[in-house]
A protein has these predicted regions:
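Conserved pre-catalytic core of RNA-dependent polymerases
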Residues: 1-152
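Catalytic palm subdomain of template-directed nucleic-acid polymerases
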Residues: 98-114, 189-213
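Basic, alpha-helical interaction scaffolds
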Residues: 246-314
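Catalytic palm active-site di-aspartate
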Residues: 5-8, 24, 58-60, 88-98, ...
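Short linear motifs embedded in intrinsically disordered, charge-biased segments
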Residues: 322-456
Length: 456
């Protein structure tokens, strides 16, 4: 049988550029091949979802799941625990070359266990086992090399096969302790637990040991030096945890799916990081542009700067005035860079926003909160809304999960970090929306109706 031949382009990640391990291999497949993969991927997804085969909180590469849904769920669990006055430890796990180490036989065995068989299984076996690849860099090709393992990175089908491969991690980690929290975005995995004493810490350590055993059984490995633990709670006893004999490094803050999460759940660490980066990009734009007309500056700001300030914002939207102002300062600076309209410089910030027909970042985050709420309540986010929100009961329905007009109820809280968390801070704004907006038939309709409601 002729082997499938793949060309691989190395994409730099971080670290030293002269080390091959710091590059990610991306498959340069043809368009027909990608179309074929997309068709098969869609059918596999339908099969997995119709049979409820995806275990636990996997948010990667799935419709209705995202970095935002992952982070919102994570911070919901942690802030709720802290509001109850308990400590919480979370280990952020780093798999070593996760996609590259998936063994063919293990992946195919798990695909079969998920009900994939027959001609599709034969196709998958040919697609995975019978291939060779070479690196293409600056027009130069390396020699062909047989591929002995790995899910094809940069492919359409590879990610869903990887999800199938690690799908049973939750069962392994929660087998002896249902209180263990497991959250995944592809291979980015978090395991956590309330830890109020040595016995709780021992249970979390047992979970970590189970993860190490799972990795050994299935040909994967962890990177102990890149795993970190966050000790949440002012009275946290900060127990030590180990991967084999390697102590997991405790951190005050850690970057998770693009968001810096601190052990106090304070948003300032994240705001400081992203505003510093955004100001740096603005400086590059200033140096690179000669003609700073309105169209050019606004296009570059919206493309390269504003996304840095809004990624997964529902999970970290700040309530401290200093953080809010620090974010707004970036947009104020961007608008001052417009040089083709001298009248803008003389206007107040509010009038500049009206003239340019844009919102303040604070208002945009409110809109983002409401949009995310709409997605949760209407099934666009594939997460049970009752996991996050509380509702006013519908007195005319016998259904205990029925709610009247999606009317939300805020929790009684003791800490500001919980009071201003997404599910509580959005309550009043959501309840104040007209029914016509809340009952919009689609996401785009909701956006348009909301913008009309606030006069945009």
């Amino acid at each position: 049988m002729k082997k499938l031949e793949l060309k691989i382009s190395p994409i730099f990640k971080k670290g030293r550029k002269n080390k091959a391990v710091n590059y990610r291999p991306i498959n340069l497949a043809s368009v027909p091949a990608k179309i074929m993969e997309a068709i098969i991927k869609d059918e596999i997804l339908i099969h997995l979802r119709n049979n409820d085969l995806i275990i636990g909180l996997q948010h990667g590469f799935l419709p209705g799941r995202s970095c935002t849904t992952n982070l919102v769920d994570y911070m919901n669990v942690v802030t709720k625990a802290l509001d109850r006055g308990v400590s919480y430890d979370v280990v952020l796990v780093d798999f070593q070359k996760a996609f590259d180490k998936v063994p063919f036989d293990g992946m195919l065995a798990k695909a079969k266990a998920h009900g994939i068989d027959g001609e599709l299984m034969n196709w998958l076996r040919n697609w995975t086992e019978h291939r060779r690849q070479r690196v293409v860099l600056n027009g130069v090709d390396s020699e062909w090399t047989d591929v002995m393992s790995s899910v094809v990175q940069g492919s359409v089908l590879g990610p869903i096969l990887f999800l199938i491969y690690i799908n049973d991690i939750d069962d392994a980690l929660q087998a002896d302790d249902e209180e263990i929290y497991v959250s995944k975005f592809a291979d980015d995995t978090k395991v956590g637990r309330e830890v109020n004493g040595a016995s709780d810490a021992a249970k979390l350590q047992m979970c970590i040991d189970s993860l190490v055993r799972w990795c050994r059984d299935w040909g994967m490995s962890l990177h102990p030096d890149k795993c970190v633990v966050l000790h949440f709670g002012p009275k946290n006893l900060e127990f030590d945890y180990y991967i084999d004999n390697n102590k997991i490094k405790p951190e005050k803050a850690a970057r998770d799916l693009g968001v810096y999460v601190s052990d106090t759940c304070d948003t300032s660490a994240h705001v400081n990081k992203i505003t510093k980066k955004a100001h740096g990009v603005l400086s590059q734009i200033r140096r690179a542009t000669v003609v700073r007309d309105r169209r050019t500056i606004m296009m570059m700001y919206k493309s390269f700067v504003r996304p840095l300030l809004e990624t997964s914002a529902p999970a970290w939207n700040p309530y401290k005035r200093g953080d809010v102002d620090a974010l707004e300062k970036v947009q104020k600076r961007a608008l001052r860079m417009i040089g083709d309209d001298g009248s803008l410089c003389k206007m107040s910030y509010e009038n500049r926003l009206k003239t340019l027909k844009i919102q303040s970042l604070e208002c945009r985050r409110t809109r983002g909160d409401l949009l995310e709420t709409f997605k949760y309540l209407n099934g666009y986010n594939d997460v049970d809304p009752y996991r996050l929100f509380s509702f006013v009961r519908d007195r005319h329905s016998r259904d205990t999960r029925s709610h009247a007009n999606n009317h939300l109820v805020s929790e009684k809280t003791s800490l500001n970090l919980r009071k201003f968390f997404f599910t509580n801070r959005v309550t009043k704004d959501w309840n104040d929306l007209p029914p016509m907006v809340k009952e919009a038939p689609s996401v785009n309709s909701f956006k348009n109706l909301y913008d009309e409601h606030i006069g945009l």
